[in-house]
Amino acid sequence: MVSAIVLYVLLAAAAHSAFAAEHCNAQMKTGPYKIKNLDITPPKETLQKDVEITIVETDYNENVIIGYKGYYQAYAYNGGSLDPNTRVEETMKTLNVGKEDLLMWSIRQQCEVGEELIDRWGSDSDDCFRDNEGRGQWVKGKELVKRQNNNHFAHHTCNKSWRCGISTSKMYSRLECQDDTDECQVYILDAEGNPINVTVDTVLHRDGVSMILKQKSTFTTRQIKAACLLIKDDKNNPESVTREHCLIDNDIYDLSKNTWNCKFNRCIKRKVEHRVKKRPPTWRHNVRAKYTEGDTATKGDLMHIQEELMYENDLLKMNIELMHAHINKLNNMLHDLIVSVAKVDERLIGNLMNNSVSSTFLSDDTFLLMPCTNPPAHTSNCYNNSIYKEGRWVANTDSSQCIDFSNYKELAIDDDVEFWIPTIGNTTYHDSWKDASGWSFIAQQKSNLITTMENTKFGGVGTSLSDITSMAEGELAAKLTSFMFGHVVNFVIILIVILFLYCMIRNRNRQY
């Protein structure tokens, strides 16, 4: 009787426990299943942070002494309107300035020219041919004055004016290094970005000026360690690098060709560790660009920006692929952990899938699933005379063990992923070659010459009608004198001919 009562109590307690907690139907098992692991794909990009880089640098611009000298000469003769020798001979000449003169001009900040000759006529007109070197007159700089007059009848007239200028200006330089010998040389660039032969020893005469380098160009060499991003087509072949961008002094340089990469006043080369294959057709480094660095709008800087954009894009892809691979690796590790724990907690897999199922393992990684009932959401470890204990719902008669966990705190047990995201955008911008102060000085002197040659000033003394007739002062009087003299001579000759004919006719009438 007593044993029957004990058995009844145990059955009642078991039934109450099953009713209060979840219930799984072992008759509705499905499967078998295995947890699917994710593929871990390594990124195509490889980041090397300690790449040895050789940098050769020179000054961005160089001081160039620029000077010019020339003269305008008008040598005229007035023999009257009937004299075919009446004319004005104009001469415009630019003189080459020698090395010694350029250096002296630079020291004195003055240039040397000849004497201004204004309305020299008669024997004084020979002064036009006495000094064609331009010596004796030191000025800060001057522009010639175009003078013409031919108002001295039966005499020669000379007008001669000088121009000169001196400036120590900047011209942009470019450094070039030979791949075979690693020898480097500095070139001075013209307005189009082409190298010109300006040295400290030889004067270059071009564009109407003479120029010489003030000091010999020098360059420095240094070694640094930089972060380089290697892009690979074939992840399994370490020799398949097709692109390599390095972050150097906040600028991005393409070192894909393992040769000297020269931009403006800097050349960069890295230690050869691998052979770079041919680049994809979408962006060819070894094909000449449709633009030239240093042109108007600084297209060389646009090339720099393009390199930065490509670098940033490749870096972003690398970081995303690294993150994807890292997440997949963690997921696979988590899968192994889930399988291990699910052998103890049969509801784990169902909870992770947000589904009320229970798992029963057939082997180390294969299991069956069965549907289960689940209590509603709650904020306590107790529910309907049940308590959640050691991963399961069990019967509970001690309410003191119930805990309200509505105000819980989060505990961090892992760290965030560290990404390599350098700050870029501090690109070193360069001016256009033609914006160098030296070429601006040359362009300005050309403009001044064009302006002064468009305005002619006439010397001499004479008529007040020069502004109306566009003649030199005194030239109108000379022309009128020549005109009257010529007509008087013609009148006398015609009168003599008429008298001669009259006399002949009269004598002939007398004979008859």
From Swiss-Prot:
One of its GO terms (cellular component) is membrane. Belongs to the baculoviridae gp64 family. It is found in: Virion membrane; Host cell membrane. Palmitoylated. Its main location: virion. Keywords: Disulfide bond, Fusion of virus membrane with host endosomal membrane, Fusion of virus membrane with host membrane, Glycoprotein, Host cell membrane, Host membrane, Lipoprotein, Membrane, Palmitate, Phosphoprotein, Signal, Transmembrane, Transmembrane helix, Viral envelope protein, Viral penetration into host cytoplasm, Virion, Virus entry into host cell. It is a single-pass membrane protein. A lipid is attached at residue 503 (S-palmitoyl cysteine). The keyword Isomerase does not apply. Disulfide bonds join 111-164, 128-158, 177-184, 228-246, 262-267, 382-402. The keyword Membrane applies. Homotrimer; disulfide-linked. Glycans are attached at residues 159, 197, 354, 384, 426. Residues 1-20 form the signal peptide. This is Major envelope glycoprotein. Class III viral fusion protein. Envelope phosphoglycoprotein which mediates the fusion of viral and host endosomal membranes leading to virus entry into the host cell. After receptor-mediated internalization of the virus, gp64 undergoes conformational change into a fusion-competent state at low pH, and the nucleocapsid is released into the cytoplasm after cell fusion. May also play role in budding. GO terms for biological process: fusion of virus membrane with host endosome membrane; membrane fusion involved in viral entry into host cell; symbiont entry into host cell; symbiont-mediated perturbation of host process; viral budding from plasma membrane. InterPro entries: Baculovirus_Gp64. It comes from the Viruses. The chain crosses the membrane at residues 482-504. The gene is GP64. GO terms for molecular function: identical protein binding. Pfam families: Baculo_gp64.
